[in-house]
Each structure stands twice: as structure tokens, then as C-alpha cells.
Amino acid sequence: MSIDRLAAFLADARQFRTIPIMRKFLADVIEPLQVFANLREEAVFLLESKDDESPWARYSFIGVAPFLTLESETGETFLIKDENGNVQMTASTLKEAFQAVERALCVKPLAEAAPFTGGAVGFLGYDFISAIEKVPRHRAPDLAMKAGHFVFCESLFAFDHEKRELSLIHYIRLKGHETMQEKIAIYRAAEERIAALAAKASRPRAEQPLLPAEDEAERAALFSKASSNYEKEQFLRDVEAVKQYIAAGDVFQAVLSQRFSVPVQAGGFAIYRILRHINPSPYMFYFRLDGIEIVGSSPEKLIQVRNRRAEIDPIAGTRRRGRSPAEDEKLADELYHDPKERAEHYMLVDLARNDIGRVAKYGTVEVPVLMEIGKFSHVMHLISKVVGVLDDDIHPIDALLAAFPAGTVSGAPKVRAMQILQELEPTARGLYAGAIAYIGFDGSIDSCIAIRTAVIKDGYAYVQAGAGIVADSVPELEWKETRNKASALIYAIEQAERLFAKGEQIVC
């Protein structure tokens, strides 16, 4: 035990009740998947960036041993529970709940370069919108998903892939009345806990079955075991209904979606491992929360807040990557000059400007990047960047809710589009089109849209995908688009089931 570190802790303990201590390790021979598998009894989330072509793919995070949760069934009241599930406090909003936790914990700030060093991690379901906008609750919330669920973890593993460095951050929690000897004992126990976690995390990786190669024939039969919440003919009729609303001037666009359910025996971690291989994305995540598993590979940021600067990166327009540099450039040029893609993208940039404008200081909203080609491992998109500086009386959570949900999964204007979708879609969306997010003690937020996401619950995996309906949409093509968007996750589920059937279970 370092005397200097102990002295620093004792000094901090005079001012703070929750004190982070951090140890750094070289991460040249371990990686996030291995660490999560080794800590599977206590780990509750894994956040990764798994696209080497993406500028966002630098950090990954693993949360261990949650000690507080923020939960809400409808978004109108949040319960703050301890690690035993006992309600400690209640709050009427997410912001009030987070601020109550901050006051109770009295956390010492941590000077560290990583964008997230501790705080709340979890999700807001799409149906949370009914608590903050004039959007009626859906008539059929059949999955009974919480509107919001966040965890605060005692220990956090933060990978910096650029530096090949791992930071292990452990939060010591004091009650405020400990004696000097008790504080020293608590600090020693924390040092031992860090050493034990580091040793466990770095164990050799358990033997894992080889992943099967992608099979085009299997891809063709993907949906044979999947059931939809929509009959095809009803979906086609609802596309026409949206077009009628567009013709009447209610909306410019609405994103109609369908949900697929697939029976599963394999665990969510097996599905996640396959998904990260076949569909790497800037935002990848795996959660185990309250009896459900969440697996996702989202390409799209919802909003990011760093040093009170908010950023939204609208994405619209997609092409596959070329098989050669020449084809890649040809496809990029085709995408950039496609008038329909450009029109949709401009609409989403306007939505982002409006969302940030609701919380930013006057005159600070800018579009430093407009309609550039962003290339990822498998696809390319039209990407813009909208930024603004938060007004002085705005909390970062206000910015998160101003952007929620994204226009790319709802429509424009957003509120009217969502009202129409609640009327037409046969079941509540649950997590789909909501947000996966972290909210740092330092006021930082990063979040992605909950698309390309599966919820595993009660023996079924649920995957939902939507298509943006506009005035000239062809119903049959929109039906196909929803299936195409769901195909990577359905394929990952099918492959995990094949391994399970062979008895080749993936550890975790």
C-alpha cells in the first residue's frame, strides 16, 4: 500500500463521501470481451466501439458491481434503489433522480482523459417519450419494458484502444462518520479489491468455439423462425396511411417499424459475440439488467455532451463499401449526389439544429460538417455535425431529452410523427428507437440510438426495424427495408442457436 496514495485518500475523505481510486495497466494482451467474460458474475454492461474505420472507436467500458439503480416504469417517477433492491429515494424526473444521487454520493472529481470515468449507464425506452411530450401511451405495451433503467457501478474498466491502456476505476463509498482507523481499513480493502479484479480480469481467455463462416444460403432463409408483430398486408396498408398523413400536411416523414421475435436458447453474450464480428459498429453494447439481456450494434449517435458542448451527428443515406478502391469511390460519389438521400439528410440536419437550439446559448448553434461521406467497415453514410454550447441553466440531461428520440427513428415534425406511429403500430416499441447512454458524474453524456438492437427476455429475442416513409414511398420496398435492417441481428441469433444446438456454448 502506497503511503502517498493513502494520505491523498484521507485528505479527500475530509471533503467527499465517494472517492475514486484508479490504477492503470498495459492492455496489449487483453481486450474487453475477455475481461467481461472473466468477470461475468459481477459485470452488468459492456460498451464497445468496434469499427476501426470510425473516428469514434477509441474507448470501451465495462461496469462491475452495481450499487445503485435508477428505474422508472413509465418515465413519470424514478425509483433510486440500492444493491439489494431497496428503494432509497424517489424523484419525479431523470434529472432530479441523477442530481439526488450526486448529492447523496458527494463524488470527488477524477482528472482523467477518458470520456467516461463513472456515473449512470443504461437506457431510455422509446415509450419514455410519453412522459415528456404530448404523445399518448401505446395501447399494447406487451413486453413490459421499463421506460428507463440506469446503474451506477462500484468499479469501471475503461479501455483506451489508441494507447493500448486499461484504467481500473474503483469508487470507495464512505458514510461520513468513520474514524481514522476505519478509513484506513476501508482503503486497504479497496486496494485488495482492485488487485483481485485486475487478477481476475487478466486470466487467460476461456476456450471458445469457432464462429461459423457467413453462409448466403442460411441468410436467404433467415426469417423462417421469426414472427412479426405485423401481418404483411397490414404493414403495406399502414405505409399508405402514413402517405395520406403526408399528403394532408401532418408530417413530412414518419418511420414505420415492425418487430420480429425469435425463440432462443443461447445466451445474449453468444449473440453479441457473433454480432460484433459480422456487423461491427461505433456503438456496440451488451447489458444484463433486471432479468433481460440487451445486445446492440448501433451506427448512430443520439447526442454527446462534453464540457457543456452538445453534438449531434445526423446520419442519413447509405451505401455498402466497394470491393475495390475504385468501386468505393464510385459508390461514394453516387451516394453524395443522390437527390433523395440529400433531401432526407437536410431534413435531419434541420431537426438536429432545432433539438440543440432548444438547449443551447443563442448564436452558438453551428454546422461545422455538412453532408460529408463517412466510411465505416461495411457501409458508408452521409454524415453531418451539429454543435452548440449549453445555456447556463441547462443540465446535460436536458440536452439528452431535447434530442430524444432521434428524428431518424420517429419522423418530422417529431411529435406529430410519433402520435401517428402510436396510432398505427400494433405494439409499443419498448427499447427500440430509444437511447443507450452514459451520464457521467462530470456532466459528460454519450448516447446512441437503440437500433440494430435485440432484447432477450423470457426465451425470445425481439428485434425491431423501421423504414422512413415519405410521399413517394413504395410499400413493398419499405417492407423489405425493415427486413434488411433486421437481418444482421436475426442472423447473429440464428448462428448462436446453431452453436447452442451443438453444445458449443459461448462462455458468459
Swiss-Prot record:
Record-listed Mg(2+) binding positions: 344, 481
Signal sequence annotation: none
SUPFAM superfamilies from the UniProt entry: ADC synthase
Sites where the protein binds L-tryptophan: 49, 282-284
Subunit structure: Heterotetramer consisting of two non-identical subunits: a beta subunit (TrpG) and a large alpha subunit (TrpE).
Biological function: Part of a heterotetrameric complex that catalyzes the two-step biosynthesis of anthranilate, an intermediate in the biosynthesis of L-tryptophan. In the first step, the glutamine-binding beta subunit (TrpG) of anthranilate synthase (AS) provides the glutamine amidotransferase activity which generates ammonia as a substrate that, along with chorismate, is used in the second step, catalyzed by the large alpha subunit of AS (TrpE) to produce anthranilate. In the absence of TrpG, TrpE can synthesize anthranilate directly from chorismate and high concentrations of ammonia.
Name of the featured protein: Anthranilate synthase component 1
Gene name for this UniProt entry: trpE
